[in-house]
Amino acid sequence: MKKLLALAVIAPLLISCSSSTKKGETYNEAWVKDTNGFDILMGQFANNIENLWGYKEVLIAGPKDYVKYTDQFQTRSHINFDDGTITVETIAGTEPTAHLRRAIIKTLLMGDDPTSVDLYSDVDDIKISKEPFLYGQVLDNTGQPIRWEGRATTFADYLLKTRLKSRSNGLRIIYSVTINLVPNHLDKRAHKYIGMVRQASRKYGVDESLILAIMQTESSFNPYAVSHADALGLMQVVQHSAGKDVFRSQGKSGTPSRNFLFDPASNIDTGTAYLAMLNNVYLSGIENPTSRRYAVITAYNGGAGSVLRVFSNDKIQAANMINRMSPGDVYQILTTRHPSAESRRYLYKVNSAQRSYRRR
């Protein structure tokens, strides 16, 4: 669950792909303007939620959390892709079960097009799809997957009769229903993107297992993934850093649009292209492929410059130092001495996930 407790100003000179830091060695005025605008938007959005739900109940979408508000911010649907749960809640003072029923049905039947849903407003723009995103990830009370509105409605009525809960936030009563995803929900989501991953792998020469491991760690295969740093989509690509770098390398001007990065195929292509750039350009001076892979993984989160500076402020000397070490020593140093705790954990998580995909 992502509770917005504070909105930090993001430093424009840091470099990364998916975390709160950004790639790019030079000051990017356009990026700063966009980031400041995004911070203002998030602040207003969080304030609207806090006024109704209370400070401790502020819940906002994140990389592994789909959160959508409707009914003038009185109702919300939250899919926690890490925990494998769907929680639908309302603070509506009149007919709360009717609000829950409608939200449950729409959540179960929503499609997988992130461009059609604004997660930072209360507009009810969720469209019922003939191919629901959650199809196969949720089973109803009879053990059946849910594709059609009739089955979703029947299941919603069952949930309201058997699983309705309530609590007080000190201001209002919150009514909620929680639904568990199937145990292998992660694999079911991953399976949707295997073809796209395979295509990007062949195009850029990046191991499929690494792409999948990055996707799992970044978003848990949530195509709606967003972040406080405005990283977008399955591989959490930032428009004005990794996105811009990839576009420049491909001879394109400008930066990829939000809609472009919310398209799964485009997101996977861009994220994989950036992995290839890290491997073949920014960190190409590292000779051992395993050591270089550790550096690439860490750099995807915290930037290539920060990886090299762990060893030396001089990039060439840093590469030479790494080349004199065993891969195990490189891994040990990156997971214990990198200045960012997030990046230290990131290498461990991605490396572990990649091993699991290699065994399949």
Swiss-Prot record:
Pfam families: Mltc_N, SLT. It is a lipid-anchor. It is found in: Cell outer membrane. PANTHER family: MEMBRANE-BOUND LYTIC MUREIN TRANSGLYCOSYLASE C, SOLUBLE LYTIC MUREIN TRANSGLYCOSYLASE-RELATED. Belongs to the transglycosylase Slt family. Murein-degrading enzyme. May play a role in recycling of muropeptides during cell elongation and/or cell division. This is Membrane-bound lytic murein transglycosylase C.
